[in-house]
């Protein structure tokens, strides 16, 4: 990542950057690198403990200029709708979808030129405990297409986190062509928010 000059995309289902890596990502932005991150939203995350560990870093990332996105739990519905309208959907694709989705893809893209794809999550367990595999290779055409599709599709399948005038987080997305803004974790119960918030204090 140190050699990244223009653009960095991180897609990781479990994303717990820690203080040091959060500061590092913000430093990339400070030197002119566009940083985009996609991870699971609270509703889409199947491990509340991971989300609890991640949520404390969101404000610092967003305030530092990182473009932070959280995957919607109903993203599969959006993708299937797009496929139907474009005529691209097949019976096989229809069987793959589910009413509740969770992000599982794991990859990094550097300067729209290099890709890293593998089993590695950006959380403490992957870094310190798990044995992970990945492939790093140059593919400018694939990396550029990925970057373009990220921008084109992201607000349909994810929420973008920003800060409101009071410095609190807000979640922006598109639904049926309209922009929607949420001021708490979207599509979650008060208990889910409370319990995960409590976990964030102790993890």
Residue ranges: model-predicted function:
Residues 1-7:
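Secondary-structure "cap/kink" motif recognition
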Residues 8-12:
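Short catalytic-loop micro-motif centered on adjacent basic/acidic residues
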Residues 15-203:
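PLD/PLD-like phosphodiesterase catalytic module centered on the HKD motif
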């Amino acid at each position: 990542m140190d050699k990244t000059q223009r653009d960095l995309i991180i897609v990781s289902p479990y994303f717990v950057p820690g203080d040091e890596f959060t500061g590092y990502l913000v430093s990339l932005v400070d030197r002119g690198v566009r940083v985009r991150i996609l991870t699971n939203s609270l509703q889409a995350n199947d491990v509340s403990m991971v989300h609890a560990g991640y949520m404390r870093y969101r404000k610092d990332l967003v305030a530092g200029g990182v473009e932070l996105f959280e995957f919607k739990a109903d993203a599969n519905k959006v993708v299937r709708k797009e496929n139907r309208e474009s005529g691209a959907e097949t019976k096989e694709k229809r069987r793959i979808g589910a009413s509740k989705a969770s992000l599982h893809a794991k990859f990094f893209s550097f300067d729209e030129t290099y890709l890293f794809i593998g089993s590695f999550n950006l959380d403490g367990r992957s870094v310190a405990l798990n044995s992970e595999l990945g492939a790093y290779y140059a593919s400018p055409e694939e990396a550029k297409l990925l970057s373009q599709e990220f921008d084109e599709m992201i607000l349909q399948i994810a929420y973008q986190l920003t800060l409101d005038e009071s410095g609190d987080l807000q979640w922006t997305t598109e639904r049926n062509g309209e922009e929607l803004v949420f001021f708490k974790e979207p599509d979650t119960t008060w208990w889910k928010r409370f319990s995960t918030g409590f976990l964030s204090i102790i993890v």
